[in-house]
Regions:
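Short Lys/Arg-enriched helix C-cap and helix-to-coil transition segments
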Residues: 117-127
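Residue-level detection of the helix-turn-helix DNA-binding "recognition helix"
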Residues: 111
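…primarily DNA-binding HTH/wHTH and HhH modules…
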Residues: 129-152
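Structural signal for hydrophobic
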Residues: 81, 121-122, 144
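Basic nucleic-acid-binding alpha-helical/helix-turn surface characteristic of O6-alkylguanine DNA
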Residues: 1-101, 151-152
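Ligand-binding loop in jelly-roll beta-barrel domains
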Residues: 114
Length: 152
């Protein structure tokens, strides 16, 4: 079963999609399918609670289950992204060092992150803390960083 739900956030609608194993996609709605199905599906309910907490400025304590499809390298990058604590940021170069890879390869994998917010690619900055690309848009990235009190 595939469940889809649109969440209204302060930064716009967030489209979520989950299967029986967990979330397969979380994107801002201008990048996602517009369907409102199964809002009571347990993974969707868990995600809504997480998002409510997050947008209230609270550190979410539990995460919904994910069902990620990607290359081995992408999976490693996404796992590293999940290790970046709320309220902190790292550069592409720092993340690349952790993975013994190049910043460009890491950037490509970060750009393919299918689960925005929950896998916090918005916490990745360019060299010298410069604000760089985000599939949800740079204005949203700035606002997400501000929610977490991350200074640019």
């Amino acid at each position: 079963m595939i469940a889809r739900f649109n969440y209204s956030s302060p930064l716009g609608k967030i489209g979520m999609q989950a299967d029986e194993y967990g979330f397969t996609e979380v994107k801002f709605i201008d990048q996602s399918k517009e369907n409102n199905l199964n809002p009571t599906y347990p993974p969707i309910k868990d995600a809504v609670k997480w998002l409510d907490d997050y947008f209230l400025g609270n550190v979410p304590l539990t995460y919904p289950q994910f069902h990620l499809n990607g290359t081995d390298f992408q999976q490693k990058v996404w796992q590293q992204l999940r290790q970046i604590p709320y309220g902190t940021s790292v550069t592409y170069g720092q993340l690349a060092q952790r993975l013994n890879s190049s910043p460009r390869a890491v950037g490509n994998a970060v750009g393919k992150n299918p689960i925005l917010l929950f896998i916090p690619c918005h916490r990745i900055l360019g060299q010298n803390g410069k604000l760089t690309g985000y599939s949800g848009g740079l204005e949203r990235k700035k606002k997400l960083l501000a929610i977490e009190n991350i200074k640019l």
